Regions:
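C-terminal structured domains
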Residues: 390-398
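Short, structured beta-strand/loop micro-motifs enriched in basic residues and often containing a Trp
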Residues: 326, 381-391
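Electropositive polyanion-binding surfaces
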Residues: 1-380, 400-426
Length: 426
């Protein structure tokens, strides 16, 4: 916020972009390279201007006091997630500095406190793996890989969540003109359908409440023991609303948080930059006396300006996500084009009324295949039981079913791949 002044050329371009976009091979930053990888990027031994949210937590991980202030910090080391995870998980000497080791152990202890606090509160903790494109030394795609969130990533996530909640609470208390990250509860219609589905998997909708995130968390814990857990996670996720930016705090259902905003990434998200501006403006005017009337008028005016911007930031976030997914699909097409005519053993990862999503072995590459491709029968999707049912033969197709597909066509420009169905494998 110190370098990106309101209404400057850099600010207008950042507002237009709304967010940085991350492709498998490169990123398109929201801010110019000189800022995103230069003046605003931490480097060991170099002073950097920062905005600090310093929190005091009790033994239960609850924030009992905090202070937000402008600061100057000097990073002691550049650490990477894998090295820190190796040290935290197995005690490997991937981190040689003893002082840093001591700090990481303390941070790990704090992470567990924060995790337990959010668990008690009812925060919903999905367990999805994240797919990433693998490359060779010539930057050519060799396949896909799946990884679950590492301990080091979980640690940073918990710290960011705590900072975001604390700053959101502060902005509401001080009536600052900021954007909030709001996640509404699921709609009644989606809850009704979800209850019907869960009833087939041993969850009695009459004994478990879905009116709050704590109920969702309890259900998720129950479903972990089932072989269909991965698919049921998707069902739960799809029943929930999308998180959006708004000018008023509305809480975050998934995190079971009463207050929530985005504060921790002002380099790559415009809403975070706006929050930083509001905080810096408050800090600079803290010693200036202003009438409550003037402050209230200014706040109302700010809300009128920001409401349209909040909608735009939400839309730009969706656009970035869509672009990232399409870029991965494009790379999959380029990768598979030389394999036209090849048979692939595949496994169904998810399904719905229009298509099955299969994972092609051995590349861990997923693609959507239309139901019409399964030409041995005419299949219908049972939304409550989560399987496909063949009208003529009565075959039931569930997630985890293996099949053989032949790659017959790849259109790189249209990002489209077609298969022929060769038969079921089990």
């Amino acid at each position: 916020a110190h370098y990106v002044r309101p209404d400057s050329a850099i600010d207008e371009e950042a507002k237009k972009r709304g967010t940085s976009v991350y492709f498998p091979t490169h990123a398109i930053p929201m801010l110019p390279e000189a800022l995103s990888n230069g003046l605003c990027s931490l480097r060991p031994g170099v002073n950097r201007l920062t905005l600090t949210c310093e929190m005091q937590l009790n033994q239960d991980g609850e924030c009992i006091d905090y202070r937000i202030y402008e600061s100057l910090i000097k990073s002691h080391a550049r650490l990477d997630y894998d090295a820190v995870a190796d040290f935290l998980d197995s005690g490997k000497n991937s981190i040689s500095n003893k002082e840093i080791q001591k700090s990481l152990k303390l941070m790990q202890e704090l992470m567990h406190l924060l995790e337990e606090k959010r668990k008690r509160r009812g925060a919903i903790q999905f367990e999805f793996s994240e797919s990433s494109v693998e490359f060779d030394h010539q930057n050519r795609m060799t396949g896909m890989s799946k990884k679950f969130q590492s301990s080091s990533m979980k640690m940073i996530e918990q710290f960011m969540l705590e900072a975001n909640e604390t700053v959101a609470r502060h902005c509401v208390k001080r009536k600052l003109p900021a954007l909030y990250r709001v996640h509404q509860p699921p709609s009644d219609l989606k809850l009704q359908q979800l209850k019907k589905t869960l009833a087939h998997y041993g969850v009695n909708p009459k004994t478990v409440s879905l009116s709050d995130s704590y109920g969702f968390s309890r259900i998720l814990s129950h479903l972990k023991e089932l072989p269909q857990f991965e698919a049921l996670q998707v069902v739960l996720l799809r029943s929930m609303a999308l998180a959006v930016y708004q000018t008023r705090n509305g809480g975050h259902f998934g995190l079971a948080a009463e207050f929530y905003t985005h504060f921790t990434s002002p380099i790559r998200r415009y809403p975070d930059l706006m929050v930083h501006r509001a905080l810096k403006k408050e800090l600079s005017s803290r010693n200036q006396k202003k009438s409550s009337r003037k402050r209230n008028i200014k706040q109302k005016h700010g809300e009128e300006i920001d409401r349209e911007l909040a909608l735009k930031c939400s839309q730009q976030e969706r656009n970035a996500e869509k672009a990232e997914l399409q870029s991965v699909d494009l790379m999959k097409c380029v990768f598979l084009e030389p394999h036209i005519g090849v048979d692939f053993q595949s496994i169904i990862r998810s399904l719905d009324s229009r298509q099955i999503r299969v994972e092609l072995e051995p590349h861990t590459l997923e693609w959507n295949v239309p139901l019409e491709t399964l030409n041995d029968d005419r299949y219908f999707f049972d939304q409550e039981r989560l399987y496909l049912s063949g009208r003529r033969q009565g075959r039931l197709i569930r997630i985890g079913q293996r099949l053989k597909l032949k790659l017959i066509r790849v259109d790189v420009l249209q990002r489209n791949i077609d298969f022929d169905f060769e038969g079921w494998l089990n």
